[in-house]
Amino acid sequence: MRRGVSPVIAGRNAKRLEQLKTEYPTIEARVTSTDDSRSLDDAFASIAVVINCAGPFLDTSAPLIEAALRNGVHYLDIAAEQAAVIAAFERFSEAAQRARIIVAPALGFYGGLTDLLVTAAMHDWTHIYECEIAVALDSWHPTRGTRLTGERNTGPRWFFAQGNLERRDPLPSRDWEFPQPFGRQEVASLALAEAILIPRHVQVADIRFYLNKLSIAELSNPNTPPPVPQDATGRSAQTFLVDVVVRKGQETRRAIARGRDIYAVTAPIVVEAATRILDGRCNVIGVQAAGELFDARDFLIALGSDQLTVQFGRPVS
């Protein structure tokens, strides 16, 4: 609504939708369910782009993409699960081309943001040897959706190494020297959507993604409470830093993003994407990664410093 569009909210919980309408009385609400294709078609009527923020995406992505295809509606989601992202590319690429729509999975903090940062760090490079992405969170209080996704996301983990997507064990934990205020942190290797998205449009041999173990410990603890809003926008007190290093030969380039609340920053990312699709700044169709769709640096800057602070430079040795 802040961007001047007229959103329609849709979901399976009629009571929750009514609560949202009480808070935002001008918004239209539509009850729908992923196991009812007719209700999905009704929900997508007269819609230009749908943003799926209802996980687990292993369950919701496919039926919503199918509905988007039937109704000629662009589809965006914020999945981090590799299997859901792989399925979007493998199952729906040709159909999305025929329907002349954009399907853009993983446009959230994990996946879309890091893909854009890698693309922006490369700048005018056409290929790189490797990229390393290290994320530091000062805490991780998971939402109920994150908990449900973790329970559902039990499939194989894929890593991108030596130019191939392959199933293997994670790399050993290591230390990463983050910029302040995080400093040196022990990080663990994880397999998320980055390994699927970045090779779609970047010629690269190796992709390594790390997350600081402090935040993993909180996520793994079933007693860690959900996030609590700390300001008028609903953001929690959580802070994050994403450190991206790309290498080509002996040269290195870097992009660093700082902000608050990994959940809250996802909203401006996916809404910026939807806005650019609606106003015609995307001239491609089909299933696409964020770095393919948008001018990465322009996109990141457009988010505004109140959401995300981004800088580019040389890595710290």
Per-region residue spans from a language model:
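Conserved beta-strand positions in the Rossmann-like core of class I SAM-dependent methyltransferases
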Residues: V8-I9, L76
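Short, conserved SAM-binding/catalytic segment
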Residues: Q19-I27, F92
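Conserved Rossmann-fold cofactor-binding substructure of NAD(P)-dependent oxidoreductases
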Residues: R30-T60
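Active-site-lining helix/loop region of Rossmann-like oxidoreductase modules
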Residues: H123-R254, A264
